[in-house]
From Swiss-Prot:
GO terms for biological process: DNA-templated transcription. Disulfide bonds: none annotated. Homodimer. In cyanobacteria the RNAP catalytic core is composed of 2 alpha, 1 beta, 1 beta', 1 gamma and 1 omega subunit. When a sigma factor is associated with the core the holoenzyme is formed, which can initiate transcription. This is DNA-directed RNA polymerase subunit alpha. It comes from Synechocystis sp. (strain ATCC 27184 / PCC 6803 / Kazusa). The keyword Transcription applies. The gene is rpoA. SUPFAM superfamilies: C-terminal domain of RNA polymerase alpha subunit, Insert subdomain of RNA polymerase alpha subunit, RBP11-like subunits of RNA polymerase. Belongs to the RNA polymerase alpha chain family.
Length: 314
């Protein structure tokens, strides 16, 4: 089996602790660069687990459109700032973080009290600004998940009162690009070089993300290795599919009226038509005797297929 090499050719930490790395994978057979690159990109962006704030509770607040005395931001703005909070959770169980801040001053993520199972990635992340004498008391729930969770209600009925749900972004990988280059090694036939650029929010290193994505893809295909058993179980079965049944109804060259009626009835191919008897055709809305005769004649002349006159008896 041909082996390819993986090399990290560039790596850096950017603002807000965001991580970036560039990887090179080579040599790959022609066409495999696009196949591997596309699969990795989709899994990196959609299937890796991450942590996010899913709900908050602020003292004296019972809806997201409220304001807090002495706090520059209203509750909705605070919720948006909490949505952008980058966290890492080492447990699958929901965790509760807390904040008690008294003005004047700026509130950042560094002031949060979080369990040992939760890590705040960027302590400088801005939350709110408090005036003299203002007080902000808050609890927030941290959960692990995959992808993006959209709330359906303003309150979390499964939790304590006054907890306000937040649209949660769990995706630790923020951006992925890939390019495929042509290479020639030792005078051999042309090969592919896959260049993969990965950006993360800082809760995971790009090399860790690439490793996890590769595991997910590999595990996805493991069941396909046992197809021999499937073949043995079905060795005596012959699935006889008439290729003519897969022909779209456009090939029958019907009149516009008959064609539109069939389309509205979700009849898109000859296979769909074969589920109907001649009586069934007449029951289609706006499908008269003339249209039915046209379809029956087209099937007979073009494909040698004759529809049964009556519905099959149960």
């Amino acid at each position: 089996m041909a082996q390819f090499q993986i090399e990290c050719v560039e790596s850096s930490t950017r603002k807000n602790q965001q991580q970036y790395s560039k990887f090179s994978l080579e040599p790959l057979d022609r066409g495999q660069g696009t196949t591997v690159g596309n699969a990795l990109r989709r899994v990196l962006l959609s299937n890796l687990p991450g942590a996010a704030v899913t709900a908050i509770r602020i003292a004296g607040v019972n809806h997201e459109f409220a304001t807090i005395l002495g706090v520059r931001e209203d509750v909705l703005e605070i919720m948006l700032n909490m949505k952008e909070l980058v966290l890492k959770s080492y447990t699958d169980q929901p965790q509760i973080g807390r904040l008690t801040a008294i003005g004047p001053g700026t509130v950042t993520a560094a002031q949060f009290e979080v369990p040992s199972e939760v890590e705040v990635i960027d302590p400088n992340q801005y939350i709110a600004t408090l005036a003299e004498g203002a007080k902000l008391e808050m609890e927030f729930r941290v959960e692990r998940g995959v992808g993006y969770r959209v709330i359906e209600r303003g309150k979390d009925e499964n939790s304590s009162l006054d907890f306000l749900q937040i649209d949660s972004v769990f995706m630790p990988v923020t951006k992925v690009n890939y390019t495929v280059e042509d290479i020639r090694a030792d005078g051999m036939s042309p090969k592919d070089r896959l260049i993969l650029d990965i950006w993360t929010n800082g809760s995971i290193q790009p090399r860790e993300a690439l490793s996890e994505a590769s595991d997910i893809i590999a595990n996805l295909f493991i069941p396909l290795k046992d197809l021999n058993e499937l073949e043995a179980a079905h060795s005596d079965y012959q699935d006889e599919v008439n290729p003519e049944s897969q022909i779209p109804i456009e090939e029958l060259q019907l009149s516009v009226r008959a064609y539109n009626c069939l389309k509205r009835a979700q009849i898109n191919s000859v296979a769909d038509l074969l589920e109907y008897s001649q009586e069934d055709l007449l029951e289609i809305k706006n499908f008269g005797l003339k249209s039915a005769e046209e379809v029956i004649e087209a099937l007979q002349k073009r494909l040698g297929i004759t529809l049964p006159h009556e519905k099959a008896k149960a």
